[in-house]
Amino acid sequence: MIPIIRPGLVVKRLQSPKIFLTLWKTCYNVKTYSTESIKQKKPQDLNWPTFLKLRKSRRIFETLTSIPTALTGLGLGSAYFLTRTVDPTMTIMGLDLFTLYVIGTIASGGLGWLLGPSIGRKIWTLLHKSQARQIAAREQEFYRHLVKNRVTPQMESYSNPIPDYYGEKIYSLSDYRRWLRDQKAYIQRAFWRTSNR
C-alpha cells in the first residue's frame, strides 16, 4: 500500500495494482491529448521564401498606394487653395497669394504621397490578416538577422557607402545571400583601407 500524490489527485492506499495502472494510464492519456491539442492549435510558421515574397508584395502595394493618396491630396489641396479669391496687392514674405496657393497645393499632394505607404501597409495587413502574426514574428527575426550581420555605421565613408543598410532590397534568399556577400566585401574594403594608412 503506497501513498500516491498527484496534482489534483490524492490516493492514500491502493488495494490492487489494477487501480494504480488505470490511474496511471488516465493521467498519461490526459497529458498526451492536452499536448497534442496544443500542438494542433499552433499555426504553421512561415518559411523564408514565402515570407520574402509576402514582404515584396507588401512593398509593391505600399508604393502603388502612394499614387491614389498623392492624387487625393493634390485634389483636396487644389479644391481648397485654388478656389480661394486672390488679392493681387497682398503679399506674404514677398510672395503673392497665388504663388503660395500653388505651393500649398503641391505640398498637399506631397503629403498624400508620404502618407501612402503607411495607409498601404494597413490595408495590406488587413488583406493578409490570417498571417499577420506569423509575418510579424518573421519580421522581427529577419531584423535580428540584419542587425547581427550588417556593417556598423562607423565604418562608412563618402567613397565607401554602406550597401543596403536596412535590407530593403532583399526579396528572396538569393538576394539575402548577395546582401551577406556585400556586407563581407564592405568589411574587407574598409579593413584594407584602414590598414594601408
Curated annotation (Swiss-Prot):
Signal peptide positions on this chain: none
An example Gene Ontology biological process: protein import into mitochondrial matrix
This protein's GO CC annotations: mitochondrion; PAM complex, Tim23 associated import motor
Residue stretch of the organelle transit peptide: 1-33
Domain of life where this protein originates: Eukaryota
Intracellular or extracellular location(s): Mitochondrion inner membrane
Regions crossing the membrane: 63-83, 97-117
InterPro entries: Pam17 (IPR013875)
Pfam families (alphabetical): Pam17 (PF08566)
Cysteine pairs bridged by disulfides in the record: none
Keywords: Membrane, Mitochondrion, Mitochondrion inner membrane, Protein transport, Transit peptide, Translocation, Transmembrane, Transmembrane helix, Transport
Segments on the Mitochondrial intermembrane side according to the record's topology features: 84-96
Assembly, per entry: Component of the PAM complex, at least composed of mtHsp70 (ssc1), mge1, tim44, pam16, pam17 and pam18.
Family: Belongs to the PAM17 family.
Function of the molecule: Component of the PAM complex, a complex required for the translocation of transit peptide-containing proteins from the inner membrane into the mitochondrial matrix in an ATP-dependent manner.
Name this protein carries in UniProt: Presequence translocated-associated motor subunit pam17, mitochondrial
Native organism: Schizosaccharomyces pombe (strain 972 / ATCC 24843) (Fission yeast)
